[in-house]
């Protein structure tokens, strides 16, 4: 049997072309668009086969000019409009692709009932050249995954925005030319589960409200040098929330899942003597106090330290079982205070960042009992930092208490 197959292959029989067309298209969909198009020269049978593939991945730099690019898109999109487009992924340079052609292209992709859409612009273009997404995109009934980078969005009436099947929404450096675009967009995605927003420094929005009954994962990351928009979160089913390098005057957590995991790196540009600032920080800490797992940055610990210095109290984190904290020397004394609010903690990872000599590390009796009775404690020191004798004492203390 094996010898027969080898002989048949060696005799030049084209067994691949004998496969059903839907299988061949499935094979081609696993290739890059470049390689898929190259198969058109194999034989007459393969000449137009790539046009039936419901996946397209392009870069405008692959084409000599805008006209050639448009001709290619025209041929692909117009070849068989009955075929649903599974995925369309384009990396374009606004300096090459004309604006009208871009709008036309996205419109046609939407008409082909696209499922996954990824649009990435050259990240180095100035704000004035960011291409605005066409209105048709905001009411695409077939879209499931939407990934946009370095484009712009106009403010639209809420009744004109409806994305009923979108489950994943990723916005990286998307400039929002309005004051309620994100909130409207998220609210229009009734089955949205995964939301990621990397802010744009030129946004007009001052307050962003994320309200969703379906979102399970939410990440927000700053690209601003100074102040980010204020945020409100109302996502009762949220299982994971990540806040990276964020800096704002307010971040309100109205609701998240009762046993969520959070990764918090946020700093508030406030005066701790201001009663409104103290109230806002209290509400933020209370909003995340029901989580089960937490990773917290030194910047956020600085906020907690400033808050504690004014009110001498912290909310109880009674559900918290796992904590990963990045500490610098000046915040070390806060650790026992914070952990004293975590009565059910059984896993503690302490990352030491540039600690110098300290005479003594004091831990509250409550923390001592917790460490000796539950879980484990792990110490991490950056590779570039040499452990001081005090750090070795701290590590020895943790080992002793967790043994």
UniProtKB/Swiss-Prot annotation:
PROSITE patterns membership: FBOX
Name recorded for this polypeptide: F-box protein At1g60400
Signal peptide: none
Domain F-box: 13-59
InterPro entries: F-box-like_dom_sf, F-box_AtFBL13-like, F-box_dom, FBL13/AtMIF1-like, LRR_dom_sf, LRR_FXL15/At3g58940/PEG3-like
SUPFAM superfamilies on file: F-box domain (SSF81383), L domain-like (SSF52058)
């Amino acid at each position: 049997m094996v010898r027969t197959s080898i002989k048949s292959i060696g005799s030049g029989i084209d067994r691949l072309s004998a496969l059903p067309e839907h299988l061949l298209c499935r094979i081609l969909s696993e290739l890059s668009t470049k390689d898929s198009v190259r198969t058109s020269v194999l034989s007459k049978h393969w000449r137009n086969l790539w046009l039936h593939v419901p996946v397209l991945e392009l870069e405008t730099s692959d084409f000599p000019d805008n006209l050639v690019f448009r001709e290619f898109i025209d041929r692909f999109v117009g070849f068989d409009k009955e075929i649903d487009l599974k995925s369309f992924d384009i990396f374009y340079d606004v300096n090459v692709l004309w604006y009208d052609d871009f709008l036309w292209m996205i419109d046609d992709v939407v008409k082909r009932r696209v499922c996954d859409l990824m649009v990435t612009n050259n990240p180095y273009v100035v704000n004035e050249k960011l291409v605005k997404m066409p209105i048709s995109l905001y009411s695409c009934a077939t879209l499931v995954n939407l990934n946009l980078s370095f484009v712009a969005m106009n403010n639209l009436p809420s009744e004109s925005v409806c994305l009923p099947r979108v489950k994943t929404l990723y916005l990286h450096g998307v400039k929002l030319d309005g004051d309620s675009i994100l909130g409207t967009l998220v609210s229009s995605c009734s089955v949205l589960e995964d939301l990621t927003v990397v802010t744009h420094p030129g946004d007009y929005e001052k307050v962003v409200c994320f309200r969703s009954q379906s979102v399970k994962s939410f990440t927000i990351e700053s690209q601003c040098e100074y102040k980010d928009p204020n945020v409100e979160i109302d996502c009762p089913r949220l299982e994971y929330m990540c806040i990276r390098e964020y800096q704002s005057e307010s971040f309100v957590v109205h609701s998240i899942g009762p046993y969520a995991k959070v990764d918090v790196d946020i700093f508030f540009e406030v005066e701790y003597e201001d009663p409104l600032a103290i109230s806002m920080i209290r509400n933020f800490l209370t909003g995340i106090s029901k989580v089960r797992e937490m990773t917290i940055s030194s910047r956020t610990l600085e906020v907690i330290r400033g808050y504690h210095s004014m009110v001498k109290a912290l909310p109880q984190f009674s559900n918290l079982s796992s904590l990963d904290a990045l500490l610098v020397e000046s915040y070390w004394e806060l650790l026992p205070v914070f952990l004293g609010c975590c009565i059910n903690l059984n896993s503690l990872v302490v990352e030491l960042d540039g600690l110098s000599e300290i005479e003594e590390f004091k831990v509250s009796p409550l923390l001592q009992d917790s460490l000796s009775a539950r879980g484990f404690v792990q110490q991490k020191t950056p590779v570039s930092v040499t452990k001081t004798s005090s750090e070795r004492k701290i590590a020895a203390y943790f080992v002793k208490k967790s043994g």
